[in-house]
Amino acid sequence: MKITDVRTTLLTGPCTNDPFLREARKLRSAAFIEILTDGGLIGLGETYAGYFCPETVPAIVDFFRPILIGQTVDDIPELWRRMYHCGNFWCRVGLGTIVLNGIEAALWDLKGKQLGLPVHALLGGAQFAKLPAYATGGPSNYPKERLAQKMDHYFSLGFRGLKVGAGSFTAGQGWYMPMEPKEAADFEADKVAFMRRHAGAEAWLMMDAHMGNNPVATWTLETATAVAKALEPFNLVFLEEPLHYTDPWGYAELCRATTTPIAGGECLTAAYEWRVFAQQDSFDIGQPDASFTGGLHEFMVVAKMMADRGRQVATHAWGAGGSLMQNVHAGFAAGNTRILEIAPDYAGLHSEVIDGGLVIKDGYVLPPDRPGLGIVLTEDTRRRYPFKPGSGEFNSVPGKILTD
């Protein structure tokens, strides 16, 4: 069975059905890549580039397309190597690698369908009978009564863990993010103490500082350390992205200074870029994304890098349904996965693509059992969510404000 074509589909739909996330973000875009064959099977993957800059994806897919025509899926890492090498001057990290990720995922999906096996079986097999899942909740909705309602909503959906952002978000007023060490530490400790009292001692709680892409200001190492130490009594699973990605050495110093586990890595592309962070022990828990890092195989390479340093990984997954399932398969195949990120109460670009293939029971995800990634992209889904140019998310900065 040989590849006959590679094509891109861009879509725009509701970001989520979660009423608490919809206060901050209403629409999302997505980029799906399909690989067609002379045997009739179609491989389907997603690149997280479709969430940020969807208009760029088709041109990059077309750049790589000739390398795949006439090929089989017998050796996916070799096909990936050829494409990566072809883009050597511009693709070693960044956008080219992110789009390549979606192509590689479609290749794995195709191979799984051809062999009748789930993708995690092709990556070495599921290393867990189940994995804990958390609801990724976006901002800390305020006032605190609203935050409590948010937690209760996620627990009602069957989650036992959740993650919220640093600072606060109040509908009609916007974001508040304390920056000075004492102010930030006091604010976050007060908030997490409230969350722990409300959720109970057994709930899995996480915080995302979002400092990897904060366009206005980022915490200094002093502020990040103060916050992390202030959160030590509350037994967080992790504190995510408390520093910018330009400072792996600062991250390493932060890890040494606190018992709060420090997580990060969602903005890193390819094992090549991850290596310095792994070697410096910059994260207690790395967060590769199997729709962004370069591919499911690259995810496995990163996971091994972290395991070799005695560290864990936790999937990052904020793309649509393809992205989510790519990360679930990779998370099960990696032997050092701590927890899976799951978009709660998701809308059509998740539910229709996943099509019942994600099973969560008592707060844990079970290994997917459908051939390939277990995702679909129907003609009805294409019709109902036509692409809207400009619907990709971008960081709001002076002169370029995010609208929805």
Which ranges hold each PLM region?
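Glycine-rich, aromatic-flanked loop segments that form ligand/cofactor-binding clefts
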Residues: L95, E104-Y142, L157-R160, R197, ...
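Shared catalytic-loop signature of beta/alpha-barrel
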Residues: D62, K229, N235, H244-G372
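Hydrophobic faces of well-ordered beta-strands that scaffold small-molecule active sites
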Residues: G43, A133-A135, R160-V164, L205-A209, ...
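Extended hydrophobic packing segments that form well-structured cores
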Residues: L373-D404
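Conserved, mostly hydrophobic/aromatic
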Residues: I3, G40, F64, I103, ...
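Structured beta-strand/loop patches that form or line metal/cofactor-binding pockets in enzymes
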Residues: M1-G39, L44, Y48-A49, A347-S351, ...
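Metal- or metallocofactor-binding catalytic centers and their adjacent structured scaffolds
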Residues: L36-L115
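Metal-dependent enolase-superfamily TIM-barrel catalytic cores that perform enediolate-based chemistry
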Residues: K130, G138-A252
